[in-house]
Amino acid sequence: MAVGDVKTAQGLNDLNQYLAEKSYVSGYTPSQADVQVFEQVGKAPAANLPHVLRWYNQIASYTSAERKTWSQGTSPLTAGAKPTAPAPAAKDDDDDDVDLFGSGDEEEDAEAERIREERLKAYADKKSKKPALIAKSSILLDVKPWDDETDMKEMENQVRTIEMEGLLWGASKLVPVGYGINKLQIMCVIEDDKVSVDLLTEKIQEFEDFVQSVDIAAFNKI
């Protein structure tokens, strides 16, 4: 989906729709594409654009120095472009190759019937071999220490030692919460069928020498 000039109301509406099921502009972690769009937006959007507002506040929580370290990404912005309607869905080549009913006279002979059955079987085989979509979620976790003397670097190292099938750790940073105490904010992507969020937070809380509590700051389906 191409997004037009985000300095216009229409462009912001397009961006809000684009971010409805995305945590970031490109991929599962923040990138230079987010920085580009963030600078174009310029200021926090109105509350009637909840997805843009959520994304804007998340990017704004990082410093300029942190943003410069992000990798490149693909921006959806099309300078000066008007929002484009979605292109018609391409026909599935597999479907085009299969004539479900064949052709011929009204009275099909045995050979025509055999050919049709073979085509139906080939079509069913092709459909059954297509990979199923894997449901994933992007999660932002707030991990809070006991006090300002907690070794936050070691706490992050402990959290990242957690390995589960379908779990991928992402970017992290320290966020001040007051009285000299910082919390660890860390991203992860999970496969919904393989990773239980409750089990993941319980495993983090098992590092009781470092961790006081774990909260889910943001949860988005991918």
From Swiss-Prot:
Composition skew (Acidic residues), residue ranges: 92-111
Superkingdom of source: Eukaryota
S-S bridge residues: none
Post-translational modification: Phosphorylated.
Chain spans, region Disordered: 71-113
Gene Ontology CC annotation, any one: cytosol
Keyword Flavoprotein: no
GO terms assigned for molecular function: guanyl-nucleotide exchange factor activity; translation elongation factor activity
CDD domains per record: EF1B (cd00292), GST_C_eEF1b_like (cd10308)
Keywords recorded for this protein, A-Z: Elongation factor, Phosphoprotein, Protein biosynthesis
Compositionally biased tracts (Low complexity): 78-89
Record-linked InterPro entries: Arc1-like_N, eEF-1beta-like_sf, EF-1_beta_acid_region_euk, EF1B_bsu/dsu, EF1B_bsu/dsu_GNE, Glutathione-S-Trfase_C_sf, Transl_elong_EF1B/ribsomal_bS6, Transl_elong_EF1B_B/D_CS
Subunit record text: EF-1 is composed of 4 subunits: alpha, beta, beta' and gamma.
Annotated protein name in UniProt: Elongation factor 1-beta'
